[in-house]
């Protein structure tokens, strides 16, 4: 996997950072599920979580002793009820959110089994560029840009705002 840059994307720079400048990075496994028609899955952040209602790619924290792939497999069963096939590590992006500094390990997934079931009360949407759902989580934006590059898409990848 290649990193976009060593410097993290800063989300909401006007807000104070919890934990200060020396806070630990949280390792996160993120699944970019892609259908044969090229549509990709976005889910909304569930009620009660930071950035509630924002749209993102599904995934979650890597637990101690887990690999990114193991965490992704576990998280996608827990969150959306699917068992995934091959995991294709794609890109890494660091994002400095006010509540956490995260290292997002994006993995493409083309095969899965089971019906989508949102176990945390979130919504889901199969999207193409430009995505229609909003608001989009800041850590999701680089992925939309990468898709635009891969797919030779010109124009805005999303619309921000509620």
Which residues make up each language-model segment?
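Conserved N-terminal beta-strand and adjoining loop/helix that marks the start
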Residues: 8-40, 61, 92
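Conserved hydrophobic/aromatic beta-strand scaffold that supports enzyme active sites
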Residues: 32, 42, 104-108, 126
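Conserved Nudix-box catalytic region and its N-terminal flanking loop in Nudix hydrolases
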Residues: 39-78
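Active-site-adjacent beta-strand/loop module that shapes the phosphate/pyrophosphate-binding cleft
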Residues: 83, 92-116, 123
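NUDIX/MutT-family hydrolases
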Residues: 108, 116-151
């Amino acid at each position: 996997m290649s990193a976009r840059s060593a410097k993290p994307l800063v989300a909401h720079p006007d807000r104070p950072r919890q934990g200060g400048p020396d806070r630990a990075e949280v390792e996160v496994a993120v699944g970019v599920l892609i259908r044969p028609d090229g549509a990709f899955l976005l889910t909304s952040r569930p009620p009660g979580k930071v950035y509630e209602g924002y749209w993102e790619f599904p995934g979650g924290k890597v637990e101690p002793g887990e690999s990114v792939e193991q965490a992704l497999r576990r998280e996608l069963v827990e969150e959306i009820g699917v068992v995934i096939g091959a995991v294709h590590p794609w890109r890494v992006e660091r994002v400095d959110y006010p509540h956490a500094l995260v290292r997002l390990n994006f993995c493409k997934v083309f095969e899965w089994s089971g019906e989508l079931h949102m176990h945390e009360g979130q919504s889901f949407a199969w999207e193409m560029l430009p995505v229609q759902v909003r608001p989009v989580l800041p850590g999701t934006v680089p992925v939309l840009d990468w898709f635009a590059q891969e797919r030779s898409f010109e124009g805005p990848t999303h619309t921000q705002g509620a």
